[in-house]
């Protein structure tokens, strides 16, 4: 994998998170769900070219500004783990989420969820969540993890690396 694609992932993700926080009206203690196909980010087909390096580049870019703003990250696993989510234990406890007994791996859970697990201080997997906003990288289908009502958010970024990306915020019904 070229350094060029990793640099693009970092640059695209940096712009995306900087724009999404204010555009989605995210505040400390709220949850951002991120679904990510590392395969799509590097130009492959979802589920076929898992890239731990691309996943690491993404999480290492997203996590610092989210933590600085007090926004809680929920990383969606792939379908092999029934789209469970990786969160910090404190997030699960605060929102009353019951942990499930799984640990993601690059080919069972996904490279992104694995990278998040490795970087969190006290990670747990939960079955479902109702996030305040979302970032879907590579058409991973995060809608099931958003609160009602989801509203599209348009940012200047339409791709993270080679993957299409869409963003959402939520509002009360």
Segments (PLM) and residue ranges:
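N-terminal glycine-/serine-/threonine-rich phosphate-binding loop
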Residues: 1-32, 52-65
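Generic secondary-structure signature for well-ordered alpha-helical cores
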Residues: 18, 22-25, 63-71, 117-125, ...
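Solvent-exposed alpha-helices and their adjacent loops that cap or buttress functional pockets
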Residues: 24-26, 108, 154-159
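Structural motif
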Residues: 32-35, 166
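Glycine-rich beta-strand-to-loop/alpha-helix junction loops that act as flexible
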Residues: 34-39, 76
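Short glycine-enriched, charge-decorated loop/helix-capping segments at active-site entrances
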Residues: 46-52
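Ligand-binding beta-strand-loop-alpha-helix segment within the catalytic cores
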Residues: 69-132, 138
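Glycine-rich, aromatic-bearing surface loops/beta-hairpins
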Residues: 114, 118-173
């Amino acid at each position: 994998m070229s350094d060029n694609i990793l640099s693009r992932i970092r640059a695209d993700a940096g712009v995306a998170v900087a724009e999404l926080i204010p555009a989605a009206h995210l505040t400390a203690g709220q949850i951002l769900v991120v679904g990510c196909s590392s395969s799509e980010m590097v130009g492959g087909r979802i589920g076929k070219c898992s890239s731990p390096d691309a996943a690491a580049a993404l999480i290492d870019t997203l996590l610092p500004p989210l933590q600085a703003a007090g926004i809680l990250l929920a990383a969606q696993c792939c379908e092999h783990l029934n789209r469970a989510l990786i969160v910090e234990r404190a997030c699960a406890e605060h929102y009353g989420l019951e942990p499930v007994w799984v640990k993601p791996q690059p080919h069972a859970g996904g490279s992104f969820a694995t990278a998040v697990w490795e970087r969190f201080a006290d990670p747990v997997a939960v079955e479902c969540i109702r996030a305040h906003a979302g970032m879907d990288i590579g058409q991973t289908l995060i809608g099931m993890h958003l609160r009602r009502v989801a509203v599209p958010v348009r940012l200047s970024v339409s791709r993270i690396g080679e993957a299409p990306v869409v963003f959402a915020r939520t509002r009360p019904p």
